[in-house]
């Protein structure tokens, strides 16, 4: 895993909100083992009850990352994409991990109530294709192509404020 110089703070403007985001880590992922190591490292940075929005193009490794993270928490079974079921919950010794995929939804806000109920008491929430501000996410994981590899960035997301305030 390599380090790359990136801005440590970034302002994100989406859907009328402006939020301060702080970069917690940036890693180059060249091998599957790099993704597994990233999941274990990210787990150490996330507080209990964290909600992580995961962004990246199709095939970027979002579900693979979630699988490694859930297994690092002690879930022994298979982790699959909830593309059609929308939400999967995995029991772990540290509490349930909720994994959602909003890719197919035209209006993700319709699922927010169900997602909120599933997240109650959860160790961790992981949402693929989720807007951090719409979800109220505490963190954002971005996976992006970088040549033959991928770049993973974990951002801590601050509260959103209306633009112009």
Stretches found by the model and what they are:
Residues 1-4, 20:
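Short, positively charged low-complexity motifs
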Residues 57:
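P-loop (Walker A) phosphate-binding loop of NTP-binding proteins
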Residues 23-25, 71, 108-111, 116-165:
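Short phosphate-coordinating micro-motif centered on Lys-Gly-acidic
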Residues 52-54:
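Hydrophobic anchor at the beta1->P-loop junction of P-loop NTPases
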Residues 21-41:
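N-terminal pre-Walker A segment at the start of P-loop NTPase domains
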Residues 62:
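Conserved lysine of the Walker
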């Amino acid at each position: 895993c390599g380090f790359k110089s990136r801005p440590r703070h970034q302002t994100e403007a989406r859907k009328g909100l402006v939020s301060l985001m702080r970069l917690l880590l940036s890693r180059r992922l060249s091998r599957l083992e790099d993704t597994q190591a990233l999941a274990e490292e990210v787990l150490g940075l996330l507080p209990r009850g964290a909600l992580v929005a995961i962004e990246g193009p199709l095939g970027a490794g979002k579900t693979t990352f979630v699988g490694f993270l859930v297994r690092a928490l002690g879930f022994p079974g298979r982790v699959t994409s909830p593309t059609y079921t929308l939400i999967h919950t995995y029991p772990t010794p540290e509490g349930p991990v909720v994994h959602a995929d909003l890719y197919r939804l035209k209006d993700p806000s319709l699922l927010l109530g169900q997602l909120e109920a599933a997240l109650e008491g959860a160790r961790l929430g992981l949402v693929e294709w989720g807007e951090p501000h719409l979800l109220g996410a505490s963190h954002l994981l971005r996976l992006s192509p970088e040549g033959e590899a991928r770049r993973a960035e974990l951002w801590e997301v601050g509260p959103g404020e209306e633009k112009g305030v």
